[in-house]
Structure formats: structure tokens, C-alpha cells
Amino acid sequence: MAKTPRRILAVLCLLAAVFFLLPLGIGILHFGMVWPAALLLLCAARLTWPDFFRRLLRPKWLRALVGCVIAVCMTAILATLGKMAMAAADRPADGQDCTVVVLGCQVFPDGHPSLMLRGRINAAYDYLTAHPETLCIASGGQNGSEPISEAQCIRDTLVSMGIAPERILLEDQSASTEENLAFSAALLREKGLSTDVAIASDNFHQLRAAIWAQRSGLTPYSDGCASPWFLTAGYWARETAALLYMVVTGS
């Protein structure tokens, strides 16, 4: 490849790496930001110093091995992203009787929902408004930095938006997606509610949430919402890694 196109591609890789790391500006750092940024920086280095990498990968068997690993990893990543997108698009049919399960995430120290939790609450509100007979489970416990449980924050916010409090059940003991769905499933059965559930969570989260819902005996559908633009890439990458880890470990 000519030097100028290589430089342009290297700059694009650097810019993409910076994009993945943008959440650092608001104090967020997780694995889904790190591994794509590291790979993009490696690509930028490969484009900038091609002779060094040619010497590094001089043995044909090593080049073939690296090529196979890259092909397998890219296939797995793209297949996982495709399944995630399909799960996010799997919404309930018109007129279908579903119970909404809102999955909690960070609550700010002042008791207000984070941007991501606000998106999930808004998705639940839209569904509950369109289906006035539907009930909702607010699911999420409380960690050390949160003044109230995530479930309580979800409930309080929905009530402030006009949803009747008697339509909202609390599940405030869970500390993971697995527990969100397992504990919500137990509450659904205790109250005799429909086990067809519309999961109010970010689009990237729908596939893993659906897997845990199915393992808890529920029939999941998406009540998904878009994530804030500067968080989206990193969380899709983190979720991809989490799903592939589940496949590899059988968890």
C-alpha cells in the first residue's frame, strides 16, 4: 500500500481509538473501551511501521497462524453483533400481553437516574403508556455508592412521570443481569403475571438479558433503547466480549 493511504488509515484508526475512550472524560472506564482501542492502536502501528511488522512476522507459519486467529475472531465478533442486533429488534407483537421488566443500572449520589438508566425508564414509560393494563417490575439492588436501590429509583421516576404506583412492583435485591431476571421471574410467578416479558434495557443488553430470561423460564422480548452516543461503541464492545466469554466458558 502507498505511504499516503497508509497514513490516512492510521489516522482513522487513531481517531476511532479516541472515540472508544471518550467516556474517560466523565470518569467511565471498562473493558469494552480498552480492547477495541488497543486493537485500533495496534492497527495504526502496523500501518505506520509496516517493515517492523514484516520482520516480526517473517516466518510463513506465524503469518498463517495470525491470519487464522484474526479471521476466527472477526467472524465470532460479527456473528455476535448480528445476534445482538436481532435481539434488540425482537419486540412484542401488537396486542401481546407482556409484563415490563426494567433492568437497573447506576443511580447518582443525589438519587437521580444516570443517563443510561433514564433511557431504560423512558422506554418502560412509553410501553406502559401505550399498554395501560400492563404491569411493570423495577429490578435492581443498591451498591455502596447509591443512596437508594436502582429499583426504587426506577419506581420513583416512573411515578413522577405519571405511571400509577400500583402498576410497579419492586425487585430490589439483584446485583447482576442474571439475578435481575431470576428474581423478577420468581416475583412474576408469585403475583400470577404473564411470563412473556418486555425487557426495558439498552439495545446492546437485550441478547444477554434474553438468555438469562429464557434460563429463568421467561419468554423475552425487547423494549430496547438507544444508549448515549458517546457510550454506545464501548458498551456494544463490552457486551460482545461478555457474550463470547459465556459461549467459551459455557456459563
Label every model-predicted segment.
Residues 5-52:
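Membrane-embedded alpha-helical segments of integral membrane proteins
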Residues 1-2:
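Short, Lys/Arg-rich, polar N-terminal cytosolic tail immediately upstream
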Residues 51-63:
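Membrane-interface helix-boundary motifs at transmembrane edges
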Residues 232-251:
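A transmembrane-helix-recognition feature enriched in membrane-embedded lipid enzymes
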Residues 79-238:
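A structural signal for short, hydrophobic/glycine-enriched beta-strand patches
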